[in-house]
Amino acid sequence: MRVSRLMLVTLRDAPADAEIISHQLLIRGGFIKRITSGIYAYLPLMWRVIQKINCIIREELNAKGCLEALLPQLHPSDLWKKTGRWEGYTAGEGIMFNLKDRQGRELGLGPTHEEIITQIAGESLHSYKQLPVNLYQIQTKFRDEIRPRFGLMRSREFIMKDAYSFHANEEDLKTSYASMDDAYRKIFERCGIKTVAVEADSGAIGGAASQEFMVTADAGEDLILISKDGKYAANQEKAISIPKAAIPLEKNAPILIETKNQNSINELCLNQNFQADQIIKVIVMLAILENGREQPVLISIRGDQELNETKLSNEISKFLNKNLIALKSITEDDLDRQGLINIPFGSIGPDLEDVMLSNASSWNKKFVRFADKTAAELELFVCGANKTEQHRAFSSWSDVGGLPKVVDIRKAKPGDQCFYDNKQFLIEKRGIEVGHIFQLGRKYSSSLEANFTNEKGSSEPFWMGCYGIGVSRIAQAAVEQSHDQSGIIWPLSISPFEVIIVIANIKDEVQNRLGEDIYKQLRHKGIDVLLDDRDERAGVKFKDADLIGIPWRVVVGRDSSSGKVELLKRSDRSVKLIESEIVVKELIAEISRKKSSISY
């Protein structure tokens, strides 16, 4: 390929909306172009990167016996309604683009394909003898992101590999899960990115075991917590830990204290000489369920801890046996709309009475109540008195009507002791999620009545797994992880080209002839090579070569008259002058050595 025919347009400066370095470099290097918010065109250089990632994915999944297919992007709403996900994905802040056809039938643009693939399996796989089966696709997906940002990291249209496995029993599902874990590690290593596998929440997909693969980077949107010995890693949404022990209150009879203008934990500590870990913080929230029901929730948590809304959502779903559409804090405006008298925010206790909700126009009239383990473990504590600017001190759980349901709904934090080994402590890193694997169990097969006949002749739902990789995300994550001040440093395996030849002066006949000769030799040997044959200043070509990040650069310049060229390695910028007759052999040897070190 010649640069003169590549439609290469590079930019000196990044657009203002490109916040992180990988986004900036992909725009500046002419890899992607923004069409509108969250929607990008993949230009020729980027498409070559994507195709190479796809090739690696296909090789590894095919080696595991997976079968490639292509599923429709338009999904009928009735399938999603059967699994209970239509409302959650389309109402309120739901992420599914949806529309109606000419006959008024509701359709969604698929962000994920569990419903479609489960229907296909239910109609195609009838016997345990046909199992296991693992189907995958590489497909454009859609998410109606509220705030698209960071280029391909959080976009509204993206490329994803998703796979779905079907099994006769749970043990076989676990075997497939382990096999896909192995395949994912090989895929990411071959793509030249360093990942950390972390325990993760299953979210709206559902299921039992779940694991994310994270590229560690300062620009990562996810906070991951890792033990110093590396034996434990989890997304903060999922992480468990041992918090610092609370300082116990001295034993005293319960008292009522006036707390004027002391509506926060900090104000209470400052004015009353208490510690945050001696106070119970009570939070009121509203859970909006898939059936439209609105359920107030009362949460008690130790004052020095933060609420983990993901854990809370899971506990509410489990307790009510319903999926959540949304979870939000209750405000005074919400109370006004329900026709309720004001709840004494800042002075709420764990025993706030249900009568507060008795006149609610649409909410359930009883709280669902939870206490985090940190609050439950306090023998004596300070809490709100359910009256404005009043608190109770030295109270026990028996003084406030007893313990509600005790659950783990706190955020694990850096510095906490590890749950598996209290001699280890958690440290934090930022991560970019590039892969996620789930053991779905029978959630979708049961909802859609997708059954097979087992060895005993009985009908039962499939056991299922699902496995996703963000293809376009891998490409940008590689840039985020591997760049310098001059531009991108592509891993060899996914670089758009392996070698770029820069002819410093295209009008010099010797340089031009030598550059063309090396180009032809490399192409003949199967090397992916790009020839910069533009009539531009050498400095412009060198800057562009640095920016687009091709791993190896051959510079055909003034030394060509003596039969020598410069060979530059992009990753460390090492340069050597080399005889033009051996540069092809050296490049083939270097590229072959690198490829063999990451192949399986």
UniProtKB/Swiss-Prot annotation:
Its EC number is 6.1.1.15. PROSITE patterns: AA_TRNA_LIGASE_II. Transmembrane segments: none annotated. GO terms for cellular component: cytosol. It is found in: Cytoplasm. Pfam families: HGTP_anticodon, tRNA-synt_2b. It comes from the Bacteria. It catalyses: tRNA(Pro) + L-proline + ATP = L-prolyl-tRNA(Pro) + AMP + diphosphate. GO terms for molecular function: aminoacyl-tRNA deacylase activity; ATP binding; proline-tRNA ligase activity. One of its GO terms (biological process) is prolyl-tRNA aminoacylation. The keyword Protein biosynthesis applies. InterPro entries: aa-tRNA-synt_IIb, aa-tRNA-synth_II, aa-tRNA-synth_II/BPL/LPL, Anticodon-bd, Anticodon-bd_dom_sf, Pro-tRNA-ligase_IIa, Pro-tRNA-synth_IIa_bac-type, Pro-tRNA-Synthase_IIa_type1. Keywords: Aminoacyl-tRNA synthetase, ATP-binding, Cytoplasm, Ligase, Nucleotide-binding, Protein biosynthesis. HAMAP family: Pro_tRNA_synth_type1. Catalyzes the attachment of proline to tRNA(Pro) in a two-step reaction: proline is first activated by ATP to form Pro-AMP and then transferred to the acceptor end of tRNA(Pro). As ProRS can inadvertently accommodate and process non-cognate amino acids such as alanine and cysteine, to avoid such errors it has two additional distinct editing activities against alanine. One activity is designated as 'pretransfer' editing and involves the tRNA(Pro)-independent hydrolysis of activated Ala-AMP. Consists of three domains: the N-terminal catalytic domain, the editing domain and the C-terminal anticodon-binding domain. Belongs to the class-II aminoacyl-tRNA synthetase family. ProS type 1 subfamily. Homodimer. This is Proline--tRNA ligase. It comes from Prochlorococcus marinus (strain MIT 9211). The gene is proS.
